[in-house]
Every structure is written in C-alpha cells, then in structure tokens.
C-alpha cells in the first residue's frame, strides 16, 4: 500500500492537491483529519493505526492523509496549548507503523503567508483568525519540513503553490 501524507498550513492548497491525486486513481482512500478527530481519539498512534487498518482491510492501493502528525504537532501547540500535541518520538512511531503497511511519502504543500491568508479569508476559515497567527503556523511548518527531511522514514517532498 502507498501511504501519502499531505501537510501544510491552512490555505496552502493541500485539499486541492489531494483532489487532483484522487482523480488520477480510483483505488485511493482519503482521510481528511480535523481537530474533531484529535478530540475523538487523542492518542495519535491509535488514531492513525485505525485508518491504516481500515485502508488495509479495504485493500486500497493508496491511502492519502489530508493532514496528519505534523499538523497535530503544529496546531495543537499553537492553537490549543499543546494539550494533544504530538512529539517527535510519536511521529517516529507513527511513521514506523506506516512503513509496516507500505511505502510512505510525505508532501508538504507550501505557499506565501499572503496567499494562504487570502484563501483563508475567502472561505471563512474558523481556526486561523489572523494573519499573525498564520505567520506562526507557517514558521512552524518550515521547522517541520526541516525535521521531516532529517528524520522521516519516508520520501519527503515540498510542493509550492
């Protein structure tokens, strides 16, 4: 099974990329993670294992996570005071689990803060309420990209929109 994790700040173009990938292959299962998933299953390892097992049972050739463990790490720290934040050690565990199911590819979708802010305002984003907050999120993703390139067990790509 191919596992593709698509990460990036609000307004970067993640969901647009995921929709394009889904159009290329009908044998794709996609899971868009939101803060409600974190609240429902606070344990990040269990949260992702449940979806990997489901994809495996469905015999999907590819599973796409629209957001994932890097978003958990960033947004939980910046927006929610770290209550359910994911640690670097937990990221390593989740990625090892992913590798036990198949190939892992991590794609960071990036854009300028100005472009992302315009998209967030256009669609009425509820979590990102200011450009300053988006700047913090963008800076955290830049650090996450560095971390992933150094330690991820999968292939890591950055796609600029």
Where are these regions (language model features)?
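Residue-level preference for the first positions of well-ordered beta-strands
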Residues: 3, 61-64
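Glycine-rich, phosphate-binding/catalytic loops in enzymes
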Residues: 22-23, 80-83, 123-126
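Class I (Rossmann-like) S-adenosyl-L-methionine-dependent methyltransferase catalytic domain
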Residues: 3, 37, 68, 121-125
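Conserved substrate/cofactor phosphate-moiety recognition/catalytic segment
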Residues: 9-12, 16-61, 71-75
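A mobile, often basic/glycine-rich helix-loop segment
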Residues: 73-92
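Hydrophobic anchor at the beta1->P-loop junction of P-loop NTPases
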Residues: 6
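Conserved phosphate-donor/acceptor-positioning beta-strand/loop module used by diverse small-molecule
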Residues: 66-68, 87-91, 99-120
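Small-molecule kinase domains that catalyze NTP-dependent phosphoryl transfer to phosphate-bearing small molecules
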Residues: 91-95, 103, 110, 114, ...
């Amino acid at each position: 099974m191919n596992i593709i994790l698509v990460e990036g700040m609000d307004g970067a173009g993640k969901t647009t990329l995921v929709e394009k990938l889904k159009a290329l292959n009908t044998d794709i299962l996609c899971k868009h993670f939101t803060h409600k998933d974190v609240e429902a299953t606070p344990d990040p390892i269990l949260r992702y294992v449940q979806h990997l097992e489901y994809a495996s049972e469905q015999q999907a050739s590819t599973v796409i996570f629209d957001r994932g463990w890097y978003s958990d790490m960033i947004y939980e720290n910046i927006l929610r005071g770290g209550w359910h934040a994911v640690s670097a050690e937990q990221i390593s565990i989740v990625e090892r689990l992913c590798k036990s199911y198949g190939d892992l590819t991590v794609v960071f979708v990036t854009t300028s803060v100005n472009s992302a802010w315009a998209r967030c305002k256009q669609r009425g984003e509820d979590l990102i309420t200011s450009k300053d907050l988006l700047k913090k999120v963008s800076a955290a993703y830049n650090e996450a990209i560095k971390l992933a390139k150094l330690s991820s067990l999968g292939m890591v790509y950055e796609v600029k929109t």
